[in-house]
């Protein structure tokens, strides 16, 4: 009952409450993003959502225009503290997680949920193994179980296992726990960036 009805109601309520804060953050960050390199304010990120459907995830742009797609050895997207692709304002937004705020619009549209597995790129879903694809049985989230219990400090495949755990145990109580732990994780700045070893990062092939 919660997964089919209650979760959507919670998403709409939280999305509407968050919307004014989203608009304020966009109003403050937009000129800083634009004047740093005269590029677009938003990055419309292609992602894979529930049931394997493609959707556009909205983000404030944190990287330089036409930045290459860097990947880890396991095929996941690189996200390091020394990422040369990030702009100065982008590094701050990424660390504070405010680049993700426009995703509340995705929540109101129904593409995403407030809590759920973080969405992957299409090329990443093609690397799923075993039960990994179960994460696509629910809507992706702005925050999620794997996002607050390890975040980017965990290897990608370990995060996938946590995503599958969430899908198999989703409940109102678990969502509340993840939601409030998100503030704790952001405040402590735990696991914001991945720590790759030499040679682990390469440019994705087209």
Identify the function of each model-found stretch:
Residues 15, 30, 43, 87-91, ...:
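Positions in alpha-helical segments
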Residues 41-85, 143-161:
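Short, glycine-rich, amphipathic interfacial segments at transmembrane boundaries or analogous
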């Amino acid at each position: 009952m919660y997964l089919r009805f209650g979760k959507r109601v919670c998403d709409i309520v939280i999305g509407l409450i968050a919307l004014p804060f989203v608009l304020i953050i966009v109003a403050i960050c937009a000129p800083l993003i634009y004047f740093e390199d005269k590029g677009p304010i938003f990055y419309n990120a292609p992602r894979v959502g529930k049931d394997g459907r493609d959707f556009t995830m909205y983000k404030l742009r944190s990287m330089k225009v036409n930045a290459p797609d860097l990947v880890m050895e396991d095929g996941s997207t690189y996200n390091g503290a020394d990422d040369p692709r990030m702009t100065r304002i982008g590094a701050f937004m990424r660390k504070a997680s405010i680049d993700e705020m426009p995703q509340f619009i995705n929540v109101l549209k129904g593409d995403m949920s407030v809590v759920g597995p973080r969405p992957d790129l299409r090329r990443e879903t093609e690397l799923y193994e075993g039960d990994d694809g179960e994460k696509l049985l629910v809507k992706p989230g702005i925050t999620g179980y794997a996002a607050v219990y390890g975040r980017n400090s965990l290897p990608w495949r370990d995060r996938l296992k946590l995503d599958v755990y969430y899908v198999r145990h989703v409940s109102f109580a678990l969502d509340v726990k993840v939601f409030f732990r998100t503030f704790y994780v952001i405040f402590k700045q735990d696991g914001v960036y991945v720590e790759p070893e030499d040679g682990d990062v390469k440019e994705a092939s087209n």
